[in-house]
Structure formats: C-alpha cells, structure tokens
Amino acid sequence: MRNINTYDWMKKWMTRSISILVMIHMITRTSISNAYPIFAQQGYENPREATGRIVCANCHLAKKPVNIEVPQSVLPDTVFEAVVQIPCDMQIKQVLANGKKGALNVGAVLILPEGFELAPPDRISPEIKEKIGNLYFQNYRPNQKEILVIGPVPGQKYSEIVFPILSPNPATNKEVHFLKYPIYVGGNRGRGQIYPDGSKSNNTVYNASTTGRVSKILRKEKGGYEITIDNASDGRQVVDIVPPGPELLISEGEFIKVDQPLTNNPNVGGFGQGDAEIVLQDPLRVQGLLLLLASVILAQIFLVLKKKQFEKVQLAEMNF
C-alpha cells in the first residue's frame, strides 16, 4: 500500500514538473519572439541617428528596398493611411535561431512629425481596420507617440503594412503649424546578423580567427561545428565555434588564412529606409482656394455670355 502511494506521488510530481517546464518554455519563447523591436528600443533613445541613419541597420547589415506611401496633404484632426511596403520573396526561407529553415518575418519603424500619432481605435474606419488586420503597433517610447514600431510579423501576410495615423490640430496644439513635414521609415525582412551586444547571430558568415591547417571538424549533437585549427606560426590549436545554420565551406586538412570564410552567408533578408513628405493643410486655405476657383469659373462664364451678347449685337447691326 505504501509503495502504491509513493508511486502515485511520484507520478503527480512528474506531471506537475512537466507542466511547469512547458509553461516556462512557452513564456520564454513568446518573450523572445516578441523581443526583436525591443532590441533597438533598449539600446537607443532615438531610432534615427543625427546622420539620418536608422539604427536597425546596425544589426541588419544587408540592404534591401522599402517604400512608403502617404497622402500629399491632410487636414487637421483626420485619420489617414501610411502604407509601408517591404518587398520580399515568399519562396525564400531564412535560417531560424535553432538552425532550421523557416518563413521570412518583417518589421518596420515609422518616425512621424511632432504631433502626429497612432489613431485611436474609435477613430479608425472599418475599411482601414480591414487593411490593418491583426497587427499590433506600439510606441518606441511611452512618451514618444510619434515613433511607431511593428514586428516581427509574417512576411507572407504583411509585406504591406498599413499604419493608421491621426494628424494634429494646430488649434489645440500650439507646437504644431500648417507646414510641410518629413516622414521617415525603416523596414526589414528576416533576422539580423548582429545582436545589440555586438555578438553574431547564426544568420551571418563565420570567418577563421587564425591562419593554419584545419586538423579537426566536430559536428555538435545539437547542430553547429567545432573547428580545430593548428596555428601556422606557433603550432597551438585554436577552436572556432560555428552555430547551427550556416553551411561549412572548408574541410579537414585544408590550409586556411585568417578571416577566410568558414561558412556561407545564410542571410536572405535585409534592411532599408526611406522617407516621404506630407503637408498639414489649413482648412481656411482650402476654402480660399475653392472660392478662388469658383470665382474664376464664374468669370469665365460671364465672359462667354458677354462675348455671345456682343456677337448678337454685331450681327443685328450688320443685318440693319
């Protein structure tokens, strides 16, 4: 009877332990997958450097195109679309953190003029909501509503990201004026090559740390390689570690030089940045323009009528 109780207790303990481990794994996995935009947020106060370079390029080394479309002008206190296009080949697979291949993800940072911000849900029309889908936008900082980040999200579904933006009203915000403003955007597809601490990810090329002969290549149980190089100058052995993901380009017995690539470059993604301009239009100016156009049209009509009247008078005089 005592043995049965002990067995039941052990069974319950193992079940609870497995459940706890699964929960920890899920929480950790979720936090890591959602951490990519936070890399820049944690390391930089402002995502755009004084030179105009967006800091995402420090981790995403390859260059790829990105486009942004915004209206030429908007009225105060109105919601408009800022459409960011991140072209990517849906057939290409990227190297994941575990070394396996997976679909490309995308992300973007949108730097708006002072006063512009993400539109509140109750101001977004059903048409724009349908274009947004299930995307979740966040501020770069709690006090920086004009800088928005998104991602990583599946590139297959969101190669075009629609940001719903609310324009400011100079009548209530004295810091804003009716002017032409710049908008900056950065967009990436795929994982980065360098982490914020300067260490390499497994999504980049690995080079030899010394010159010598490759004496041993050990394939690790969980993937990746340990490459032993006999230094050509002093004979000491140097071990270079290659994580799972990149493919080896060298073999045992081969003589290699320092900085020679040991692997291919598995990166298929890249980062790009662009800009656009938008005019915050004064409604009174628009009304004035409409009145001017109306007056010009009326003047043209009166001129045509006057001309016809004059022609009739001339025709009557000729007949007389």
From Swiss-Prot:
The chain crosses the membrane at residues 286-306. It comes from the Eukaryota. Heme binds at Y36, C56, C59, H60. Keywords: Chloroplast, Electron transport, Heme, Iron, Membrane, Metal-binding, Photosynthesis, Plastid, Signal, Thylakoid, Transmembrane, Transmembrane helix, Transport. Its main location: plastid. PROSITE patterns: CYTF (PS51010). InterPro entries: Cyt-f_TM, Cyt_f, Cyt_f_lg_dom, Cyt_f_lg_dom_sf, Rudment_hybrid_motif. One of its GO terms (molecular function) is electron transfer activity. SUPFAM superfamilies: Cytochrome f subunit of the cytochrome b6f complex, transmembrane anchor, Cytochrome f, large domain, Rudiment single hybrid motif. Its cofactor is heme. It is a single-pass membrane protein. Residues 1-35 form the signal peptide. Binds 1 heme group covalently. GO terms for cellular component: chloroplast thylakoid membrane. GO terms for biological process: photosynthesis. It is found in: Plastid, Chloroplast thylakoid membrane. Component of the cytochrome b6-f complex, which mediates electron transfer between photosystem II (PSII) and photosystem I (PSI), cyclic electron flow around PSI, and state transitions. The 4 large subunits of the cytochrome b6-f complex are cytochrome b6, subunit IV (17 kDa polypeptide, petD), cytochrome f and the Rieske protein, while the 4 small subunits are PetG, PetL, PetM and PetN. The complex functions as a dimer. Belongs to the cytochrome f family. This is Cytochrome f.
